[in-house]
Amino acid sequence: GSSGLISMPRV
């Protein structure tokens, strides 16, 4: 994912 306000899963 990404480090920030929102977390996006690595797919």
Curated annotation (Swiss-Prot):
Pfam families: Periviscerokin (PF08259). One of its GO terms (cellular component) is extracellular region. The modification Valine amide is found at V11. Expressed in abdominal perisympathetic organs and abdominal ganglia. The keyword Transcription does not apply. It is found in: Secreted. InterPro entries: Periviscerokinin. The keyword Secreted applies. One of its GO terms (biological process) is neuropeptide signaling pathway. Signal peptide: none annotated. Mediates visceral muscle contractile activity (myotropic activity). Belongs to the periviscerokinin family. This is Periviscerokinin-2. It comes from Blaberus giganteus. The lineage of its organism: Eukaryota, Metazoa, Ecdysozoa, Arthropoda, Hexapoda.
